[in-house]
Amino acid sequence: MKTGKKIAVLALIFVAAAIIYFVWPLGRKEENKTGVVYTAMGEAELPVVYPTALGRELAPLFGHREELAVTAERDSLLVLPEDRRLPIRIQYGDEIKTLQYEIRTMDMTHLVERTTVTDWTEENGQINAVLPVQNLLEPETQYQLGIQAVLSDGTSAWYYARILETDNDHAAQMLALAEDFSQKTFHYDSAQELTTYMESTPSADNSSFGTVTLKNSFTQMTWGSLGVSRGETVFASLKELSGDLANIELEYYVTREADGGAGGTDGGETEVYGVTENFTLKWSSQRIYMMDYERTMNQLFSGSRELFSGKRILLGISDGDGLYAKKSESGRYTA
């Protein structure tokens, strides 16, 4: 087989793997202001549910074909609004015929509520609904929420999250701080305010943007000379909330125009990176403390010829984790 054909095969394999790894967690189809469209695979072929809590629309919930019988995923924690009415938006919802939800204790042994949703509207394939959670929950106690969407073919899609009823708005304040911190890293002047949280040390590794923490330099935190631009869509999720301590995650894409430097890419080619920021925050009446922070960055492999050097593949910026191999259908090539 000619070298050109080998490169084409390897490129196709890596593009497929990269799409699954980077784009699946960020939704089936998202478009940012750069005009680049990303499409995910697999479970996201089902309708996608976007809950609203803490004053904003949060990261999407992806559907499962089967009801989870034992425990729910711990990816998302939703703090209920004061009236316990939880708004959701369902993308690609034109396949949905009926919608209901159930609430169980976290050990799944006790059914607290099961309700058919009637308060919903549909327009252009998108559903806006409200889950009218009843006054049956113990405050400051997490429960398992399962949303069942019955589709036009008679099958069901299940969506899971944890829910919590609380009297304080500390989580919303901490989410606002995380979003503000993230936004300011893209603006050098306003980012000066972030030095309050930083703990820069000479021993920190400032040689790569793959992983950045509070111990890195200010230049590293503010993207150095990369010249990246963030897309308009930022997915936020509350991972944990225990008293005044919260763990929050932001996911988004950044793009940059390649300059033809390291990596051999031609000028003008748009490079795309998946970015995840994780914050551990502690609320107090005086201020919010940042207990831990980590930003990881992975380049989305495009498969262009410039990213191949002989038998090597130039993967660009990466956090050093999550590199997988995949074989071609014939089993002859591994990438």
Regions found by a protein language model. Name each.
Residues 1-15, 23:
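N-terminal Sec-pathway targeting helices
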Residues 26-45:
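Ser/Thr/Pro/Gly-rich low-complexity linker/stalk segments immediately outside membranes or between
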Residues 27-31, 71-87, 96-124, 129-147, ...:
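Surface-exposed, charged secondary-structure patches
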Residues 40-101, 109-111, 142-150, 154-225, ...:
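Core segments of small alpha/beta cavity-forming domains
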Residues 83-84, 106-108, 241-245, 281-288, ...:
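Short, solvent-exposed coil/turn segments at beta-strand boundaries
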Residues 92, 151, 252-256, 285:
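Beta-strand elements of well-folded, non-transmembrane domains
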Residues 164, 291-302:
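Short, solvent-exposed aromatic-acidic interface loops
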Residues 234-239, 276-282:
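Hydrophobic/aromatic beta-strand elements that line small-molecule binding cavities or substrate pockets
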